């Protein structure tokens, strides 16, 4: 059985089949940690596209106000630094075997749709606070989730 790093979507229809796939691991006598949490889909392509549109809009806004360094890539990193933070990784030097622990910005691709919605809300609030009004297409997933929240 090849378990995805993202986990398995468990539901009534596949419970028995998953149990059969896990059983051989248990017969080896090893113990495992199982975390059960509600399933949420990974952040969507619509959310990703909106975030990149916003990085460009914020970049244009900042550059027009003299912040010439504020490229879309810089904006993306700055917002991830502020609102997502960092993850720790151990990297192994393949020649020496030395392990170096580094910190790298979290990736939006690791967020679920709810976490990405929260990130986008924080970005939008910050942008509004500096006077930058971001475009929100009426039919985009962000707007649909917002409408659902406010219903």
Swiss-Prot record:
<dbReference type="GO" id="GO:0003697">
    <property type="term" value="F:single-stranded DNA binding"/>
</dbReference>
<dbReference type="InterPro" id="IPR036619">
    <property type="entry name" value="NinB_sf"/>
</dbReference>
<comment type="similarity">
    <text>To equivalent protein in phage 82.</text>
</comment>
<protein>
    <recommendedName>
        <fullName>Uncharacterized protein YbcN</fullName>
    </recommendedName>
</protein>
<dbReference type="GO" id="GO:0000405">
    <property type="term" value="F:bubble DNA binding"/>
</dbReference>
